[in-house]
Amino acid sequence: MILDYNPSMKQQLACMMTAYMAELKSDIPEEIIRGRLSDYIDEMSEKGIIRIRIAFDGQLPIAFSVFQIDRQESDWCMRPGWGFIREYYVSPEYRKQGVGKILAEDTEYILQDLGAADLYLTSTGAVPFWQKCGWRLTAAVTPKGQSILEKHF
């Protein structure tokens, strides 16, 4: 089951976000992730700047997607009007079981429904996954060296 995020899911998202950041080898302390970052995500979500979808196995949250339509109001706007998957995570024990693909399709559908004909994302280690989902690796990279992938409808 995949649900839209709401503030009652804050703790669940914070737990997954902590695991996600650890996997990325981020130096952001856990208390910041569970505090200010979680508050920031709530604020951006409430303003309608980002959308968040969380996948569950029963009551257990197992994956999330944070995405937006790039526009000037957002804190990240590389390609105005494009759909952008900002953050994406599937718990390790649920990888290679189809959860990631289902959540990706769900996210893409919503972005398309919001008016995006073109999508992009950045990735450090999941390029093969995204390519299997129909995304194309571009020659461009972010200032942090992340690969940029695109998908067009």
Regions found by a protein language model. Name each.
Residues M1-C15:
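A short beta-loop-alpha structural element at the N-terminal edge
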Residues T18-I41:
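Conserved GNAT-fold acetyl-CoA-binding loop/helix
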Residues D42-I54, F84:
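A short helix-loop-beta-strand connector motif used in the catalytic cores of GNAT acetyltransferases and
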Residues I54, L60-I69, F84, Y89:
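Conserved beta-strand in the GNAT
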Residues W76-P92:
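Conserved acetyl-CoA binding element of GNAT-fold acetyltransferases
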Residues I85-Y88, D118-T122:
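Conserved hydrophobic beta-strand within the GNAT/NAT acetyltransferase core sheet
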Residues V90, K96-Y109, K132:
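Conserved acetyl-CoA-binding loop-helix of GNAT-fold acetyltransferases
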Residues D113, A117, T124-I148:
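Conserved active-site alpha-helix within GNAT-family acetyltransferase domains
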